[in-house]
Amino acid sequence: MTNLRKTHPLMKIVNHSFIDLPAPSNISAWWNFGSLLGVCLMIQILTGLFLAMHYTSDTLTAFSSVAHICRDVNYGWLIRNLHANGASMFFMCLFLHVGRGIYYGSYLYKETWNIGVVLLLTVMATAFVGYVLPWGQMSFWGATVITNLLSAIPYIGTTLAEWIWGSFAVDKATLTRFFAFHFILPFIITALVIVHLLFLHETGSNNPSGINPDSDKIPFHPYYTIKDALGLMFLLLTLLMLALFSPDSLGDPDNFSPANPLNTPPHIKPEWYFLFAYAILRSIPNKLGGVLALLASILILLIIPFLHTANQRSMMFRPISQTLFWILTANLITLTWIGGQPVEQPFIIIGQLASISYFMLILVLMPLAGLFENYMLKPKW
């Protein structure tokens, strides 16, 4: 009798995706983050669903409904802490996943990469509207500052901003629609994840060497299911440590105060995972220029496949490109630090230099390094 998992219409899909999937024999722990992101998404949807059962999206009661969840709902404090810190884990895994893709040349699978960039943008949008929901000071002012950027668009900007707000400022209508967006977007993300996997399974996984792995493949189960389980254990351990021992360490103290449109916080800043983009936005003194730089900082990922000049796919055997990659990593950490600092010297100039070097590294230095490495590898006799 033929195995049911190989014949049943639904189980056959699962089998080809997670069980009998041929995977390269040499993929490292850097390939764990895809499955970890799937787990993060499931955790966020489940905890979010339970939070939505008790949350009210009204400016008068939103803040107190979150307090009610933490005080009066059974394990509400835990669900909220898991959801808030789960977002941080989600972005940590996302950044490592994208970094892996850049280092090992996975971006040459263009369809998978482009869907991945769309996923990144959608997750960022979801996190932004979600941060507004508790209706604390930083929620309100963060929403005000970021939605106000739309008004920088020539001619239609102000109309567009008011259309998003549903009013003449961030108010009740804004909160209600942001809750609606925050509820629907994770399901759109889930659909995009399926498309992402569909394109990935058309080509198969890349591997650290960047060489075609077709001659040496192993079944996904049990080899990579057990390897993913180890990564999952570390993820859950870190998330639980954060949520149980230090749940507010990544949040902003200003968000413990209810939103007050008459009182501006001294430093308006987003959550840590947006600080690098926020630093790039602030580094340009012109409003429209800042908005364009902000968009470019993420959308630049879409042109990375066209900037690949090296004869080798992976950076595994390309020391100059490796050095530039780690400089880029340090640069992003610097931008994250600057994004959380007040707008004063020396932070302004450091932010501007880091922003310039971010674009220089990706657009100029890394493609040149690839060409130079090609030249160095040419036989000279």
Curated annotation (Swiss-Prot):
Its cofactor is heme b. Heme b b566 binds at H97, H196. GO terms for cellular component: mitochondrial inner membrane; respiratory chain complex III. It is found in: Mitochondrion inner membrane. Coiled coil: none annotated. Keywords: Electron transport, Heme, Iron, Membrane, Metal-binding, Mitochondrion, Mitochondrion inner membrane, Respiratory chain, Transmembrane, Transmembrane helix, Transport, Ubiquinone. Pfam families: Cytochrom_B_C (PF00032), Cytochrome_B (PF00033). One of its GO terms (biological process) is mitochondrial electron transport, ubiquinol to cytochrome c. A ubiquinone binds at H201. InterPro entries: Cyt_b/b6_C, Cyt_b/b6_C_sf, Cyt_b/b6_N, Cytb/b6-like_sf, Cytochrome_b, Cytochrome_b_C_euk/bac, Cytochrome_b_N_euk/bac, Di-haem_cyt_TM. The cytochrome bc1 complex contains 11 subunits: 3 respiratory subunits (MT-CYB, CYC1 and UQCRFS1), 2 core proteins (UQCRC1 and UQCRC2) and 6 low-molecular weight proteins (UQCRH/QCR6, UQCRB/QCR7, UQCRQ/QCR8, UQCR10/QCR9, UQCR11/QCR10 and a cleavage product of UQCRFS1). This cytochrome bc1 complex then forms a dimer. This is Cytochrome b. The lineage of its organism: Eukaryota, Metazoa, Chordata, Craniata, Vertebrata.
